[in-house]
Every structure is written in structure tokens, then in C-alpha cells.
Design a protein with these regions (language model features):
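Alpha-helical substrate-recognition element adjacent to the catalytic core
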Residues: 45-78
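Hydrophobic/aromatic residues within well-ordered alpha-helical segments
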Residues: 38, 62-66, 90-94
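Short, acidic loop-to-helix structural element flanking the phosphoryl-transfer center
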Residues: 9-14, 19, 99-124
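Metal-dependent phosphoesterase signature
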Residues: 74-115
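Short alpha-helical
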Residues: 37, 65-68, 105, 112
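Active-site neighborhood of HAD-like aspartate-dependent phosphohydrolases
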Residues: 2-57
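Conserved acidic
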Residues: 34, 57-58, 86, 102
Length: 125
């Protein structure tokens, strides 16, 4: 799958090869399996504010900003956006709840990929 995508890119761009200088990684869900902690934190904090967001639905908002997640739930229940003060307060609680968890486990294979990148002399960010 990746080989085909690379071949298409090389053909369409006119390049003969790809020479990576560095590799940029996202942490959550790529290097560390932190999404269960995010989902649990969102669920607990929303319930404290009488807002309904299941752990399962929290996964659907992965990658969305905290403010957007709060507003989606708030709009669904109340037909309007949450105030900036409410967003700040709810998101601060969610962050504190998330940070109370132990360090998440590495995603399978993440350490090996980082070691390979280091081995071939590429920077990782």
C-alpha cells in the first residue's frame, strides 16, 4: 500500500526518490496509547457538568480541539455554544483528569521505529 503511494508520488512529482531529513510524529495514538485516558477523562468531566459524552463517542472526537468537542456536546444538549469561561473551565478539568493517569503504554512497534530512524541518522521530532 505505502509502496504504491510512494511510486505514484514520485511519478507525479518528477522526483526519482524521497530523501527524508527528519520524521515528525504525533504522540497520542501514534507513539503512546493514550486515547483510553482521553476518552475516560472526557466522559468523567462532561458528566460532572451534566453533559453527556460516552467514552465511545469521545473516540469519535479524537483530533478535534477541546473547545470544539465541548461545543458539539453543549450544542446538542442546549442548542447553543458554551461560553468561553465554561470551555476554559471544562477543558482545564479534563486536562487535570487526563494528567492524573499513569504514563500510557507505548504503541506496539513505536520504540522500534524510533530506533530505526535514529540508526539511519534521521532526526525525529
Amino acid at each position: 500500500m505505502f509502496q504504491e503511494a510512494i511510486a505514484r508520488y514520485l511519478q507525479s512529482s518528477g522526483h526519482s526518490q524521497i530523501q527524508l531529513k527528519s520524521v515528525l510524529f504525533d504522540m497520542d495514538g501514534v507513539l503512546f496509547n493514550s486515547m483510553p485516558y482521553h476518552a475516560d477523562a472526557w466522559h468523567k468531566v462532561m458528566e460532572r457538568h451534566d453533559l453527556h459524552l460516552s467514552r465511545e463517542e469521545a473516540y469519535l472526537h479524537e483530533g478535534r480541539t477541546g473547545a470544539a468537542t465541548i461545543n458539539i456536546v453543549y450544542q446538542r444538549q442546549y442548542g447553543k455554544d458554551a461560553t468561553p469561561e465554561m470551555i476554559k473551565s471544562i477543558y482545564a478539568e479534563k486536562s487535570a483528569e487526563f494528567n492524573s493517569n499513569p504514563e500510557p503504554e507505548r504503541m506496539p512497534g513505536a520504540w522500534e521505529v524510533l530506533q530505526k530512524i535514529k540508526e539511519i541518522g534521521r532526526a525525529h521530532v
